[in-house]
């Protein structure tokens, strides 16, 4: 049995890329692209590349400052602890960044984390991600991989997310939950 969560605006209260945009001074540009992508109006991959490109030059120390501001959604820590006590595996499948997902993994005891690898060179964000972009289709693919690894069926999966890029994961899970869903 497995519960898979989106990260931004689901397990945590904020959208990390918007927090990073604040640090980079590009809030308005990134926020507009993010809203359109979450509503499914702009292709996620292209919008993601555009948003990440705007972060080019951001110092790695800014990621640490953002990490300090991130708040776990009320009740999420208790939910994860309860799921673990009941024998469930947990996963973060996020269009956000592994830098933050791995911190949450350590903090909450999450079993799996799959997100985008923010490329950092010489202590600065390059404006690119390493590896394939974790979009909606990739989330569903990663969920299938975890299910195979755990030797369970998709019917034994609960998936929780808030945006258009979560729909493929929610659709294949035994139970898909739209949490604070965007219109």
Per-segment meaning from a language model:
Residues 1-45, 49-50:
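Active-site neighborhood of HAD-like aspartate-dependent phosphohydrolases
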Residues 30, 56-63, 122-126:
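Gly-rich Lys/Arg/Thr-decorated short loops/hinges at beta-loop-alpha junctions or inter-strand turns
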Residues 25-26, 57, 118-119:
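Short connector loops/turns at beta-strand edges and beta->alpha or beta->beta junctions
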Residues 47-77:
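Metal-dependent phosphoesterase signature
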Residues 65-183:
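C-terminal cap/substrate-recognition subdomain and adjoining C-terminal extension
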Residues 15, 42, 58, 71, ...:
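Conserved active-site and cofactor/substrate-binding residues in soluble primary-metabolism enzymes
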Residues 4-10, 33-39, 56, 96-104, ...:
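Short, mixed-charge, low-aromatic patches
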